[in-house]
């Protein structure tokens, strides 16, 4: 306290952990894969978001995106589907994503922390924070490594997210 104000005094305790997928090999994709899926399937483009890890965050600098997240939170399928079979709806509406994720079905089904279906992410009360202006900082760093994101960048559990409240 002699050297400054604790960060918690400036944030209204709105400090959150980044996203835990439970299966990064399935849900975290390369820019090339993201571009191919988005080009073939424009409806799926909204489900592919920039994704950073703690080591990506630099002091005052957010580098070009090297990874993307397939972002389907818990409840995504049930809020949209018209068919009784969730996977059938998913495969019909997002065939390229369904094809990609189907390779990981066995592992994804075993995740304890997942959404309503194996292709959905775990529940989280603060997913909306990722769409707003926020500060991203790595959980482990030497010195201050933080960056202001104007909105839209998602981060893994090796990052903390400070909600700006805007």
Residue ranges and their predicted role:
Residues 1-166:
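Polybasic, glycine- and aromatic-enriched phosphate-binding surface used to engage nucleic acids
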């Amino acid at each position: 306290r002699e050297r400054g104000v604790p960060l918690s005094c400036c944030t209204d305790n709105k400090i959150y952990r980044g996203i835990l997928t439970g299966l990064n090999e399935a849900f975290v994709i390369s820019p090339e894969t993201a571009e191919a899926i988005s080009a073939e399937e424009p409806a799926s483009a909204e489900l592919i978001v920039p994704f950073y890890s703690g080591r990506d965050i630099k002091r005052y600098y957010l580098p070009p995106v090297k990874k993307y997240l397939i972002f389907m939170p818990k409840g995504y399928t049930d809020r949209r589907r018209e068919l009784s079979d969730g996977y059938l709806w998913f495969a019909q509406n997002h065939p390229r994503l369904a094809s990609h994720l189907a390779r990981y079905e066995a592992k994804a089904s075993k995740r304890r922390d997942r959404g309503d279906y194996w292709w959905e992410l775990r529940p989280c009360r603060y997913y909306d924070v990722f769409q707003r202006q926020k500060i991203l900082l790595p959980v482990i760093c030497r010195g201050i490594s933080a960056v202001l994101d104007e909105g839209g960048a998602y981060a893994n559990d090796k990052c903390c997210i400070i909600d700006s409240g805007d």
